[in-house]
Amino acid sequence: MTTSTPDIQPAVQHTAQVAIAGAGPVGLMMANYLGQMGISVLLVEKLDTLIDYPRAIGIDDESLRAMQAVGLVNDVLPHTTPWHAMRFLTPKGRCFADIQPMTDEFGWSRRNAFIQPQVDAVMYHGLQRFPQVRCLFSREVEAFSQNGDGVTLNLKGPDGERETVRADWLVACDGGASFIRRTLNVPFEGKTAPNQWIVIDIANDPLATPHVYLCCDPVRPYVSAALPHGVRRFEFMVMPGETEAQLSEPHNMRRLLSKVLPDPDRVELIRQRVYTHNARLAERFRIDRVLLAGDAAHIMPVWQGQGYNSGMRDAFNLAWKLALVVNGKAGEALLDSYQQERRDHAKAMIDLSVTAGHVLAPPKRWQGAVRDGLSWLLNYLPPVKRYFLEMRFKPMPQYREGALLIDAAGKTSPVGKMFIQPQVTLESGESVLLDEVIGANFAIIGWGCNPQWGLDAGQIARWRAIGVRFIQVVPAVQIHREQDNAPGTLRVGDTQNRLKSWFAQHNTAIAVVRPDRFVAALAIPQTLGAQLTALAEKMTLATGDTARTEEKVA
């Protein structure tokens, strides 16, 4: 595919293995992971700095696990509020749906409030760890072309000067209005909500109550959310005929805030903005050497806080695959699994977000009355109440095709689902989360057995070439028994008995876990060799002889 290019000869030419368009959260996460794996990256952003105003306010356990994988979670956590409940209220203030999951199966609180600009800044500063990763601001992509060898981008710099970038691959993280997606003529079908919302952020929280509340007022629905560092967010529906300029006038701002505050004049306004809620999904996520991620691939209403988190899932899913391909350790066909695995789940999250929006602001007033009455009755049924409290309605990613081996158990199988992350005990006696042992790698995790047993030297070399960690899990009381140590296998103690319970529940002994923490295959010691051979073929892995064995971790 070729686009028109300016006739002016560029003064500056850049090269990189991967070019990323857009320094938002998805582009920053991609750059951090690829940098960690030794890939040269050029990140280009048309703005002159990172966006400094709050947008997303919810980060989930899967996204925190991605932050952990790139070594940034400890810097991110101070900008979060864990265990952040979401409560739907009737116009009279009665809570009819309380979403307050207390599970930590993936190592972190499932629902967390956060300040996005500060977390974005953490990811941006994280790039300084990698000398081969560069970020160029004030660079607009004017045109690009691709062939079988790579992608060429034509950039316009801050003073109008022309620059070119030559990269093996391009990841488009350039937002919902993606120039790259539009240039490639990829359909972006869906709907735009008829009503806009005005978002008001206030410092020194004048309300200071915890959690987030969605008030289903038929006159003007609104949201009230407590955020870290003393920030309060209010969101009000913009009614027909109202404009951002009108609502931003002092007397109208006072009128809005009087619904939620006893003294709307005593506030420290940070900013206000009007947003439109869209629900759209790209028809394709990969177009030859160009890959779409984040809002460039899908956009959704904010009501479940999943736009940001869906973008993080894209980055975590795509980055490790792209690293393998760029480093010559897997064939390009592995990248086809990105769309296979991510598109259906992104659509499910869009549908959930649209439904939540209809609960908050039903299109018809009578639907609100039915909602209130039905929810009041259902809350007296313990299973229904737990369904909301534990956030079981959230579609958890479960891949049924892609870079994995589906087994006969089908939907009940853990293959294609995220592996748990409990605390484990090291041989030193230290207690850590499991991912700290795995690192940014594949892991072959066996309960009570050495997962290398039964594998031939060629298989071990092939998987070590892509950085696999062989891990043996034992009861914590056995961790100091040196006679059980096997060369090349890490041993951890099952501190909380959760790993034993997981393997028992699924009637298996060994799990092959991908770098994005999804289970790729199951086995017992006698079948692991055959499973690894089949999985390597499915992922088009290079053989142990041809793969570059050095592990590039900054």
UniProtKB/Swiss-Prot annotation:
Main enzyme class: oxidoreductase
Gene Ontology molecular-function annotations: 3-(3-hydroxyphenyl)propionate hydroxylase activity; FAD binding
Pathway participation: Aromatic compound metabolism; 3-phenylpropanoate degradation
Chain positions recorded as FAD binding sites: 17-46, 285-295
Xref: Gene3D superfamilies: 3.30.70.2450, FAD/NAD(P)-binding domain
InterPro entries according to UniProt: 3-HPP/3HCI_hydroxylase, FAD-bd, FAD/NAD-bd_sf, PheA/TfdB_FAD_monoxygenase
Cofactor dependence: FAD
Example of a GO biological process term: 3-phenylpropionate catabolic process
Key words, A-Z: Aromatic hydrocarbons catabolism, FAD, Flavoprotein, NAD, Oxidoreductase
EC number(s) given by UniProt: 1.14.13.127
Signal sequence interval, chain numbering: none
Superkingdom of the organism of origin: Bacteria
Reaction it catalyzes: 3-(3-hydroxyphenyl)propanoate + NADH + O2 + H(+) = 3-(2,3-dihydroxyphenyl)propanoate + NAD(+) + H2O; (2E)-3-(3-hydroxyphenyl)prop-2-enoate + NADH + O2 + H(+) = (2E)-3-(2,3-dihydroxyphenyl)prop-2-enoate + NAD(+) + H2O
Keyword NAD annotated: yes
The protein's role, per its UniProt record: Catalyzes the insertion of one atom of molecular oxygen into position 2 of the phenyl ring of 3-(3-hydroxyphenyl)propionate (3-HPP) and hydroxycinnamic acid (3HCI).
Family under the similarity heading: Belongs to the PheA/TfdB FAD monooxygenase family.
Identification of the protein by name: 3-(3-hydroxy-phenyl)propionate/3-hydroxycinnamic acid hydroxylase
Protein source organism: Klebsiella pneumoniae (strain 342)
Organism ancestry: Bacteria, Pseudomonadati, Pseudomonadota, Gammaproteobacteria, Enterobacterales
Gene that specifies this protein: mhpA
